[in-house]
Structures are given as C-alpha cells and as structure tokens.
C-alpha cells in the first residue's frame, strides 16, 4: 500500500447509541451491531472505551414537550444528544467502580458499564484499563475514580 490516511489520532471518537440504549458519561461502552454502541456488560471483550457524554439513540428521541430517558424536559431549544464521544487508548478518565481497587490494579468491565479489579488470571481480552486513582478506590466512601484506558 503506497499510502494511507490516518483516521484518528488519540481520540475521542464519536459513536451513535444502539436502539433503546441510554448512554451516560463515565460508563464503559461496547461495540454493538450496525456500528453502534451500548453500555458494556460484565466481562465484555468488546469494550471500546469510556463515554464522555450522555446520549440516546436517534430513534429514541422523545416527542416535543415530553421528557427523555434521562428525565430531562425536551423542548426545541434543548435537543437531546444522539452521539457520544468515547475516550480510549491511554486516556485517563473518571469511571464508576463496583468494587474496591488499589492504585495500579488492572481493571475489567462489570455490570452496567462499571469497572472492578481483574482476578488472578483474567482473559487478556477483558482488561479495559488500570486504576490510576492515587489512593485507590473504596466504593463505600467514593465509587468514582480515575482509570487509564487500555
């Protein structure tokens, strides 16, 4: 191949949520059919990164003078986002932890787009990042902490 065009450099990359998916910033997202994304399931091997914004699928956009799936009023002056910026490839972002994690722990996806420390012998495809919260994360006191994406 004589030359190629670079598609992205460092991200984030924008995706459209899958039908009936409510994407919230700070949650892990995974690849879905048709080039769309959804909230990552526990143990997912298709995690793309961390959502930086909230959004709905375009087909789920509510009618005028209603509320969206996030409970926000919908008026013509405040459209609901239908695309999501996703951080990946070494980005450091805040995520929600489902279990306590120490600084430096390798992390895997857990239910509802959250993260937890990997077990002793995880499938390498399930590692989504590293805990970079300096004091670690203690879920009972604060379940949000820093993670560097894989």
What are these regions (language model features)?
Residues 1-150:
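Surface-exposed, low-hydrophobicity beta-strand/loop segments enriched in small/polar/acidic residues
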């Amino acid at each position: 191949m004589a030359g190629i065009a670079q598609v992205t450099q460092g991200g984030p990359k924008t995706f459209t949520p899958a039908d009936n998916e409510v994407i919230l910033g700070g949650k892990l997202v995974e690849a879905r059919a048709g080039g769309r994304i959804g909230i990552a399931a526990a143990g997912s091997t298709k995690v793309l990164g961390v959502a930086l914004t909230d959004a709905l699928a375009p087909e789920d956009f509510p009618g005028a003078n209603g509320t969206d799936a996030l409970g926000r009023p919908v008026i013509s002056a405040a459209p609901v986002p239908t695309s999501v910026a996703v951080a990946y490839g070494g980005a450091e972002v805040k995520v929600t932890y489902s279990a306590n994690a120490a600084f430096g722990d390798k992390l895997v996806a857990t239910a509802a787009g959250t993260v937890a420390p990997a077990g002793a012998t995880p499938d390498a495809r399930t590692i989504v990042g590293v805990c970079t919260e300096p004091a670690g994360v203690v879920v009972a006191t604060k379940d949000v902490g820093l993670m560097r994406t894989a």
